[in-house]
Swiss-Prot record:
SUPFAM superfamilies: PLP-dependent transferases (SSF53383)
Domain of life: Bacteria
HAMAP family: HisC_aminotrans_2
Gene3D superfamilies in UniProt: Aspartate Aminotransferase, domain 1, Type I PLP-dependent aspartate aminotransferase-like (Major domain)
Entry similarity comment: Belongs to the class-II pyridoxal-phosphate-dependent aminotransferase family. Histidinol-phosphate aminotransferase subfamily.
Keywords: Amino-acid biosynthesis, Aminotransferase, Histidine biosynthesis, Pyridoxal phosphate, Transferase
Pathway this chain belongs to: Amino-acid biosynthesis; L-histidine biosynthesis; L-histidine from 5-phospho-alpha-D-ribose 1-diphosphate: step 7/9
Designated name of the protein: Histidinol-phosphate aminotransferase
Gene: hisC
Species per Swiss-Prot/TrEMBL record: Buchnera aphidicola subsp. Cinara cedri (strain Cc)
Reactions mediated catalytically: L-histidinol phosphate + 2-oxoglutarate = 3-(imidazol-4-yl)-2-oxopropyl phosphate + L-glutamate
UniProt entry tagged with the keyword Amino-acid biosynthesis: yes
Keyword Ribosomal protein: no
GO molecular function, a single term: histidinol-phosphate transaminase activity
Length: 353
């Protein structure tokens, strides 16, 4: 069997998603999902036919929502497939390099490892901003730069001006990919308005977070017409199933967009409530500012708290293994009941810190 497996695959460490880790509990605050069940109803009687390669009705709906023309949109199976197809399309194995800035979303690293792509890794600064000085030193001959915006797991935006400086400083053969998985929580900061200004700019979007549709795996790549045409060459022949496209189309009708925006306001309200209450807990050392539907918290001793929360049936995401995030846990913003339960459990903690 060893002879069958390429060396870079045999040593590969897969992405540890919340579901893959598989810890069981009663309150899940570990995957940055919407805490509310989507009310979309669906019935199918057309499952005997293959779906459209790129469902036109869905393209039209997302075009209206995003303000991006239809021919500048590619529908993918979540933003993760967007990362995968961009890397696979534009990078040659063991030749090309990508760049990213940890601690950040780990799929940039995992997909580079899958396709045996070289990596230039520039850690962010202690203030969670981009290290422009070191980026400029190592930016030559990089094929793709991935920027998570707002960043996961830190929750903050990188300086827009610094990102523009990076785009202006690279050659036309370097692609800048802005991962906007969480942008709906602060939509006014989107880079969509810059698409027509830069030929090498790509934006990733998803319906998993603000739209509450994590289960259907539906994302979008936004770029110029030429890049979208190239990506279509590599995309699977039937990437979006009929049930997925039908549900996504419904989610993008005006009524459901209004509900999504209402849920965002609920999340922001719950986040403020949660932060205000957590500030009263003495063993919490820092609550980092977040523009997303989660917060990053530094504890006096995170491993103890992580295990304690599991014992109480509350599942959060351990980030203490990530560079610069010692004793940090990432907590998704849940319902007001879930937030209050988390506060109650943390408030009565009597263990050793």
């Amino acid at each position: 069997m060893k002879r069958l497996i390429p060396k870079h695959i045999s040593i590969l460490k897969p992405y540890q998603s919340a579901r893959r880790i598989g810890i069981q509990g009663r309150i899940y605050l570990n995957a940055n999902e919407s805490p509310w069940i989507n009310n979309i109803q669906y019935k199918f009687n057309n499952l005997n036919r293959y779906p459209e390669f790129q469902p036109y009705k869905l393209l039209k709906k997302y075009s209206l929502y995003s303000g991006v023309p239809i021919n500048q949109i590619l529908i993918t199976r979540g933003a993760d497939e967007g990362i995968e197809i961009i890397t696979r399309t534009f990078c040659e194995s063991n030749i090309d390099k990508i760049m990213f800035f940890p601690p950040t979303y780990d799929m940039y690293n995992v997909i580079a490892n899958i396709f045996n792509i070289k990596k230039i890794i520039i850690p962010i600064l202690s203030n969670f901003q981009l290290d422009i000085k070191n980026i400029k030193k190592k930016i030559n001959n990089v094929k793709i730069i991935y920027i998570c915006y707002p960043n996961n797991p830190t929750g903050n935006f990188f300086s827009r001006n610094k990102i523009i400086r990076i785009i202006n400083s690279v050659s036309k053969t370097t692609l800048i990919v802005i991962d906007e998985a969480y942008i709906d929580f602060s939509i006014k900061y989107s880079f969509v308005s810059e698409l027509n200004n830069f030929d090498n700019l790509i934006i990733l979007r998803t319906l998993s977070k603000s739209f509450g549709l994590s289960a259907i795996r539906c994302g979008f790549v936004l770029s110029n017409v030429k890049i979208i045409k190239i990506l279509k060459k590599v995309l699977a022949p039937y990437p979006i199933s009929i049930p997925v496209s039908d549900i996504a189309i419904q989610s993008l009708c005006s009524q459901n967009i209004f509900l999504m925006q209402k849920n965002i306001l609920r999340i922001l309200k719950n986040k403020k409530f949660l932060i205000d209450q957590l500030k009263k807990i003495s063993y919490i050392k820092n609550i980092f500012h977040s523009e997303a539907n989660f917060i990053l918290i530094k504890f006096a001793e995170s491993k103890t708290i992580f295990k304690y929360l599991i014992s109480k049936g509350i599942i959060v995401r351990d980030q203490s293994h990530n560079l610069g995030l010692k004793n940090c846990l990432r907590i998704s913003i849940g319902t007001i009941h879930e937030c209050q339960e988390l506060i109650n459990v943390l408030s009565i903690y009597k263990g050793k810190i």
